[in-house]
Curated annotation (Swiss-Prot):
A Pfam family hit: CYTH
Domain CYTH positions: 1-148
Domain of life from the UniProt record: Bacteria
Protein name: Inorganic triphosphatase
GO MF term list: inorganic triphosphate phosphatase activity
TM spans (from-to): none
Organism (species): Nitrosomonas europaea (strain ATCC 19718 / CIP 103999 / KCTC 2705 / NBRC 14298)
SUPFAM superfamilies xref list: CYTH-like phosphatases
Temperature-related activity annotation: Optimum temperature is between 50 and 55 degrees Celsius.
Function statement: Involved in the hydrolysis of the beta-gamma-phosphoanhydride linkage of triphosphate-containing substrates (inorganic or nucleoside-linked). Catalyzes the hydrolysis of inorganic triphosphate (PPPi). The enzyme has a strong preference for linear PPPi compared with cyclic PPPi (cyclic trimetaphosphate) and to the linear P4. The longer chains polyphosphate are not hydrolyzed. It has only a slight thiamine triphosphatase (ThTPase) activity.
Reaction(s) the record says it catalyses: triphosphate + H2O = phosphate + diphosphate
PROSITE patterns: CYTH
Amino acid sequence: MTEIERKFLVATFPDGELHAVPLRQGYLTTPTDSIELRLRQQGTEYFMTLKSEGGLSRQEYEIQIDVTQFEMLWPATEGRRVEKTRYSGKLPDGQLFELDVFAGHLSPLMLVEVEFLSEDAAQAFIPPPWFGEEVTEDKRYKNKALALSIP
């Protein structure tokens, strides 16, 4: 499946109704690998995700795993982890966004992502005033880099 998204720093936390869920992610690959293999605990659900390289558009495959599989693989992510709270909401035009507030050594970093059905829609998107600088193409803001305390 192709994932098309743009990522921004957050200038100010948005007003409105948001749904929050705690996340922890660990990476089985390093930032220099051409693919990304990630484990994620999202509330009480567990996932393994494979992503290709890319900025605006890249391939993504995700499967749900059980807690036993997650806990068996989690130790292999030591030193390559992030913890955050993900807030989901809608922009005034109905477009969904996901805002991540990072914990621990990455606090007070906040990033917001918006996914699109096409690259044309992504290019036409005008971010609202509470969005900050765009970092879609900046590899330092990929979660696998953040897991190593970069930037």
